[in-house]
Structure formats: structure tokens, C-alpha cells
């Protein structure tokens, strides 16, 4: 009678645990990177919306000799033929608390405030990557004097 040497093949429990830990680490790293990319994309969309509002406000100033009192002047459907018209899908009117309590739900949320002397305006948007509100000024708007909404 001959005996066969049977070699146990397979993985030990320790080897399986090591593989599971490595997979978990890779998952966490990829999720963190993905969230960072999402925040960069949202910030880019918010900045684009703010740039669009700033450009349309300048066009409004050229056509009407004053800056719009609020975003509604730029998004008025009755003015859709005007060069300063801004589609409501492009921008969402909103306000930001200082400091911001929470990020806006929509990336294209913009706060627009015309200056008291109507020679410029402040356009604010949320930077999702840095969790802060950023501001862009159009025209010759003094930093501390704003009115309207």
C-alpha cells in the first residue's frame, strides 16, 4: 500500500485578514480622493456661475447705465432677447451667512449685492474645496458699502 502526500492548499486566516485590510485601506483612499474631486467640480461650477453673473452685470451696466439691483433683473424672462439675460438654470439666487453655516445645496448658488452708489456689485459664491465663501467685485464697488440683495 502506498500513501499519498496530500498538501493542504489554501490561505490561512491571517493572510485573508491582511488582504481584507489592504482592500479597506484602498477603498478609504479612493473615497477621499473622489470626494476631493467632487468638491473641486462643485467649486468650478460655482466660480463659473459667479463669472457669468459678473459678465452679465457688466453687460447690463453697459446697456442700462447702472448695475442691476438684484439677480432678478438679469434672469427676467421678458428680457430674454437682451445680451445681459441670464438663464435661471445657470444661477441660483441665495445668501451666505458669515461664517457659512453649511454649504449650499446647489453649486450654482450666488449672492449678488449691488453697491450703494450703483457703480459696481459684489458677487459671492461658495468654495466647496476650502469650505468658505469667496467674493468677486465688478465695477468700482467700495469694499464695505453694499445694499440690496
Predicted feature residues:
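Short, low-complexity, Pro/Ser/Thr/Gly-rich segments in the mature regions of secreted, periplasmic
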Residues: 129-149
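Extracellular/periplasmic head regions of type IV pilus-like filament subunits
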Residues: 62-130, 148
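Residues within membrane-spanning alpha-helices of integral membrane proteins
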Residues: 21-22, 49
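N-terminal signal-anchor/signal peptide hydrophobic helix marking the start
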Residues: 11-21
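Conserved Walker
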Residues: 12, 29, 44
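N-terminal leader/signal peptides at the extreme start of proteins
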Residues: 1-11
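C-terminal juxtamembrane segment of a hydrophobic transmembrane alpha-helix
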Residues: 23-41
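Membrane-proximal N-terminal amphipathic helix
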Residues: 39-67
Amino acid at each position: 500500500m502506498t500513501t499519498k502526500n496530500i498538501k493542504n492548499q489554501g490561505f490561512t486566516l491571517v493572510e485573508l485578514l491582511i488582504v481584507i485590510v489592504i482592500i479597506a485601506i484602498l477603498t478609504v483612499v479612493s473615497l477621499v480622493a473622489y470626494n476631493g474631486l467632487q468638491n473641486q467640480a462643485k467649486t468650478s461650477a460655482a466660480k463659473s456661475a459667479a463669472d457669468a453673473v459678473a459678465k452679465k452685470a457688466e453687460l447690463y451696466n453697459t446697456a442700462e447705465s447702472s448695475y442691476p439691483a438684484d439677480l432678478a433683473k438679469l434672469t427676467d424672462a421678458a428680457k430674454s432677447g437682451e445680451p445681459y439675460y441670464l438663464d435661471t438654470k445657470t444661477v441660483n439666487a441665495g445668501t451666505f451667512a458669515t461664517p457659512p453655516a453649511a454649504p449650499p445645496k446647489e453649486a450654482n448658488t450666488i449672492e449678488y449685492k449691488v453697491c450703494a452708489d450703483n457703480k459696481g456689485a459684489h458677487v459671492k459664491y461658495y468654495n466647496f474645496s476650502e469650505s468658505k465663501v469667496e467674493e468677486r467685485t465688478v465695477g468700482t464697488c467700495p469694499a464695505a458699502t453694499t445694499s440690496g440683495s
